[in-house]
Amino acid sequence: MILYHEGALIESDQAFFYSKKNYFKAIGDVVFTQGDSLRMTCNTIEYNGETKIALAQGNVYLERPDMNLRTQILNLDRINEKAFYNTPGVIVDSTSTLTSNQGQYFMNQKKYRFISDVTINNPDYTVNSEQLDYFTESNQAYLYGNSKIEGKTYTVLCERGFYDTEREKGIFKQNATLYYDNKIIRGDSLYFESDRNYAAATKNISIVDTLNNSIITGHYGEIFKEKDSAIITRRAMAVNIIDQDSLFIHADTLVATGPEEKRILRAYYDVRILKSDIRGRSDSLYLDESIGLTKLLKKPLTKQQVQVFTEQDNNQKNPVLWFDKSQMTGNEIQLLSNTQTRKLDSLKIDGNVFIIEKDTLSEDGYQQIKGGILRGAFKESKLDNVVITKNTEMVYYLYNDEDLQLIGVDKTTCSALKMEFFDGQIDAITFLVSPNGDVYPEEELPKNERTLKGFIWRIDQRPETIEDLFDENDREEQFPEILKFQYPKEENTFTKKSQN
C-alpha cells in the first residue's frame, strides 16, 4: 500500500485511511520517506493529515544524511520539523553514538535534546548527563543536571556546562570538578581545553595535588600541564603537611611548578604562614618539598632605600618567624625538613639575625640577641637550640631562680653563643667564646640602652588564625569571569508531558 501526502510517501503491507478524519494507519514493513533528506522504517505508523504528525511504533529507524536514530516509539512533526521519543533511543552520527531514555530532534536546527540517562560515546571521550542539548553542525553540547565527561586524560563533573565535543573544551559550573594531571580542581566555574593542556577556575577554587598531599585554594587559578605549572591568585592559600601538621601559606599569588617528584611552590607579595607552633611573614617564599626546603625571602631594596633605611627599617622589611614566644628576623630564613619523615630538622638565618622574646616578668623588658648568622636544630619538631655567630650582641633580663627577683640586665657582646629552648622560650644561653659585657641594675640602664640597635617588636603582624592570613584586599567580592556563554533559549521546554 502507498500513501502520498504533501511531499511525504508512506509504503506498507496494510493501510487504513479515514477520510473524514484525514487520518491514515499503516501496518507491516512501513517505509516513510520525505524527499531525499529523511527515511524512516517501523512496524506501524499513524499519520494525521491535518497536523502532519506521524506516530511510528516498533523498531523505529530514522535516517538522515548526517545521522540515524533507533527507538521503539517516535513522533514526527512535519510542520515543525521535529521528532521526539519517550522510549530509549540511540542516535549515531559521523563521530559519536548518543543514547537516552527520551529525546527530541530539531531537524532545521540540527539539534538534539536528550533527557534521562543521556550518554555520548566517542573514541576519545564519553559524556553522561541528566539532560543534554547537542548541535550537530557545531558539535557543541549543553549539559543540565548531574553530568560527567571522561576523556583519555581527564574527567569533568558538573551540574551545568558547555562542551565542544570536537575540540574537547568547555565551561562547567555548579559543583564543577576536574580530575586532571593527578590533581582535583574545583570551582564555581571551570574552563578546560584538552588540546592546549590548559584549565582555569574562578571563585571558591581548590586544587588538590593527590601525589604531594597538598591543597591550594583561591578565587582564580590557571593550570598549564605541559609546563607543569599552576598559578593561583585572589585569596590564594596553600596547605602543605609537615610532621602531620598543616602549614598554611597565603600570598597574593601562588605558583606551583615542576613535575610531581620535584614540585616547587613559590609565593609572591605579602606572604603569611601559619602552623600550630610557627607563624611567619615575608615578601616572598620558596618551597621545594623534594629536598625539604622552605625559604622566606625579602624584596631587594631600591637604591634609595639602601641609602636612607635605618637598621630598624631593614628589620621591618626582613622576613620574620615566631616560634612560640620567640620572634626571629633576618635577611633570609630557611626551614629544612627531613624528606622521609617530613619533620622539621633545622633552621638557618643568614644576615642581620635578630631574636626577640618578651620578658614575662617585667612590664616592658625584652630578651634580645642579634648577630650575623644563625643555625638551629629541631627536636621532635620543636626548636631545640640555635647557634649565633658573627658580631653577636645580647640584652637579657636575669632573675633569681628562687624568688624570681630581677638581678639585672645582662648586656654582652661576643663572637658566638648558643641558646637552648624549653617549652617554647629561651631556657639557657652559653657563650662559645669569651664574652665582653656586664650586668646592670635596671634602674641604672637608660631605656634606650635596654634595646639593641635595630630593635622592632612586630607582634602586631603575627597571624594567630587562618583568617588573620588575609587582609581587606583579600575580601574583594568581584572575581574574573572565565568565559561567558548562553544556554539555548528552550532550556526548560523539554518535559515528559510534552511527548504524551
Task: Set out the residue ranges of the language-model regions.
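N-terminal amphipathic/hydrophobic interface segments
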Residues: 1-500
